[in-house]
């Protein structure tokens, strides 16, 4: 359970032999109580700034590209994806281009929304990470595709009733049509399920995926994934100065001749990221990882973004600030030494990764 602002403050007050606060008196604190509230926040800010790459602040996000758009905003609240937050540090080593996922709610995480009933009564099943249950039922969804482009389709099926039933996987230019693809997926290993991996070529700008179980037995679809049949490409990071000296003239020229699959990513001078070459498709997705800015505590019941293991480090640092306020240098030095030791232990156990050597030499045949 995450530690509340009130708990942190009272832990410091308790060790200082001062009167503690309650939820009802927290907003009306006085004297040393108010000072400790400020010192707890100050301690948290210092820890965030010192460690930065705290797992509790980690977020992974994605940005869809647009044809001809070179620069994109870095994360802010609920942008580019719902759940995003203002960033503190971007991990540019994680930028990669992945094919854009076309299916909406293809993982069935909490519901079967975005799917239309074709026949029967498709239902949600909470098994696994969430599944679409079909019992004498069918469901379909329309997708935006590009004519003559090849797409990769993956479907995982679980035979919940161990009946040996078959699932029809249909792709067509209308709901429940099979003019593009007609596959039958069966499960023989009832414990593990079965996965369909196949490809199809779109024949229109709108394509329909249909999942159909004609039998009165339970078949659960674990996930449906459709994207362009292209691989994942890691982007190399370069500095803005490097981009400006090498590619500025090409990228700023009013011509689409230089558009293509991005290979490089760089930070602009106005807190955005740029891609080179400029994307030539809307069907790329840029995925990357970052650490968000923490949320300051205000009310007594507010909880910190950090893991509870950070509680003692925050308390010790807040004690140090209080001892300095009280002009008690001996106690302050003891608290400082304890804080440094706690922070070092926490960093090694919680954040530092195992070190290893990697050979980056390139072998050239003589």
Predicted regions and their residues:
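Glycine-enriched, solvent-exposed interface loops adjoining structured elements
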Residues: 1-105, 187-191, 223-366
């Amino acid at each position: 359970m995450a530690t509340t602002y009130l708990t942190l403050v009272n832990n410091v007050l308790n060790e200082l032999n001062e009167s503690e606060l309650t939820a009802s008196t927290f907003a009306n604190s006085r004297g040393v109580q108010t000072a400790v509230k400020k010192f707890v926040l100050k301690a948290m800010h210092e820890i965030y700034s010192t460690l930065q790459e705290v797992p509790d602040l980690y977020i992974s996000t994605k940005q869809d590209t647009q044809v001809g758009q070179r620069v994109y905003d870095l994360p802010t609240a609920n942008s580019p994806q719902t759940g995003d937050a203002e960033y503190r540090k971007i991990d540019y080593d994680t930028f990669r281009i992945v094919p854009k996922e076309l299916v909406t709610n293809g993982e069935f995480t909490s519901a079967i929304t975005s799917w239309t009933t074709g026949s029967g009564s498709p239902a949600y099943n909470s098994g696994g990470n969430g599944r679409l249950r079909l019992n004498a039922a069918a469901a379909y969804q329309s997708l935006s595709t590009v004519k003559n482009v090849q797409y990769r389709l993956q479907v995982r099926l679980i035979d919940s009733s161990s009946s040996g039933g078959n699932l029809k996987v249909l792709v067509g230019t209308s709901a429940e049509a099979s003019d593009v693809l007609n596959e039958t997926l069966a499960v023989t290993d009832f414990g593990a399920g079965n996965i369909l991996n196949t490809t199809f070529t779109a024949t229109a700008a709108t394509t329909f995926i249909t999942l159909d179980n004609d039998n009165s037995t339970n078949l659960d679809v674990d996930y449906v994934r459709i994207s362009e049949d292209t691989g994942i490409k890691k982007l190399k990071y370069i500095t803005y100065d490097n981009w400006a000296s090498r590619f500025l003239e090409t990228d700023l020229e009013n011509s689409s001749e230089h558009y293509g699959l991005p290979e490089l990513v760089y930070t602009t001078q106005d807190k955005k990221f740029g891609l080179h070459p400029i994307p030539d498709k809307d069907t790329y997705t840029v995925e990357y990882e970052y650490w968000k800015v923490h949320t300051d505590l205000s009310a007594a019941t507010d909880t910190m973004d950090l893991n509870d293991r950070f509680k003692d480090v925050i308390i010790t640092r807040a004690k140090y600030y209080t001892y300095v306020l009280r002009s008690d240098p001996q106690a302050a030095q003891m608290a400082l030494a304890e804080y440094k030791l706690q922070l070092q232990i926490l960093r090694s156990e919680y954040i530092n990764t195992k070190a290893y050597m990697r050979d980056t030499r390139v072998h050239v045949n003589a």
